[in-house]
Amino acid sequence: MNKRIAIVLFNLGGPEDIEYVKPFLFNLFYDKAIINLPNPLRYIIAKIISITREKKSQKIYSLIGSKSYLIQETEKQKLAITEKLKEFIKEDFIIFINMRYSTPFAKEVIGQIKEYNPSEIILLPLYPQFSSTTTGSSVKNFLQNIDIDIPIKTICCYPIEEDFIKAHVSIIKEKLYDKNFRILFSAHGLPKRIIKAGDPYSFQIKETVNKIVKELNIKDLDYKITYQSRVGPIEWLKPNTEDEIELAGKLKKDIIIVPISFVSEHVETLVELDIEYKLIADKYKIQYTRIPTLGTNKIFINSLTNILLRFINNTNTNLVMSSSSKRICPNKFTKCLCNLTN
């Protein structure tokens, strides 16, 4: 009998309309992986943040049509993966989308999966580099809500997957020019305390960038890894993307910015990178080139499809590993999903 496979794509989510901004913010900051405090304190803080930031966030979303593009981008990726996967397998499968902080939530998706009645589930995060605050939170939430006994295979990350790297290299090469430029590989920031607690995120970001730089094979390439989207007074990963654009401006170096941890266009790319950070470059009259996210890039979709095929064909019914089916993080990273779920 052929397998029936439920594939679940994990992503952050976002407000479908301006009125959903506050509940989205509440869900985000109520997550214990984001604010690790006990209730009722975490609930109170999430309420305060969602109320105080609502108007500012609504104004930001109004710049891109008053909604999150991430939702429709994820739908496009789902369709592209579905079509590609059909070329390789005869098994029956359905791809579901599970957003962490907006609909469709885990309970809703699990209900749909139960109706489908699969023989196994494969979890695929649309976060190439693992963090306990993104993939870790989504996987934990899904497993806490599932109430059926089905084998579950979990892809924790794919920061150095061959075609994932090739997809980035291909897009970057299209935008390169023979000028005095610096590449900034901009990743979403994290508080340093999360990294110090054993989260492998920044390690995996470096691994991704090292592979891309090696494949670009440009002598004396001027590049830096930077971090964006910091919030609040606590210490975050450095250097900050906006500070590095400022520095490049003072040096009269043109900027090529690569959103290295994002695979979908959303508020952090369309507003923060395209509008806010570009203003810094404009102030110094330097050229500012923003590389698109991978989206439905054919090489990237091939990469995700190949990862899924590897896990579909793996006989380990409860596999939790990187895309290469082995652990890639040093043991000091205790928050690695391989530690948390095995």
Curated annotation (Swiss-Prot):
It is found in: Cytoplasm. It catalyses: heme b + 2 H(+) = protoporphyrin IX + Fe(2+). CDD domains: Ferrochelatase_C, Ferrochelatase_N. GO terms for cellular component: cytoplasm. Pathway: Porphyrin-containing compound metabolism; protoheme biosynthesis; protoheme from protoporphyrin-IX: step 1/1. GO terms for biological process: heme biosynthetic process. It holds the Pfam family Ferrochelatase. InterPro entries: Ferrochelatase (IPR001015), Ferrochelatase_AS (IPR019772), Ferrochelatase_C (IPR033644), Ferrochelatase_N (IPR033659). Keywords: Cytoplasm, Heme biosynthesis, Iron, Lyase, Metal-binding, Porphyrin biosynthesis. The keyword Iron applies. Fe cation binds at H188, E268. The keyword Lyase applies. Transmembrane segments: none annotated. GO terms for molecular function: ferrochelatase activity; metal ion binding. Its main location: cytoplasm. Its EC number is 4.98.1.1. Belongs to the ferrochelatase family. Catalyzes the ferrous insertion into protoporphyrin IX. This is Ferrochelatase. It comes from Rickettsia prowazekii (strain Madrid E).
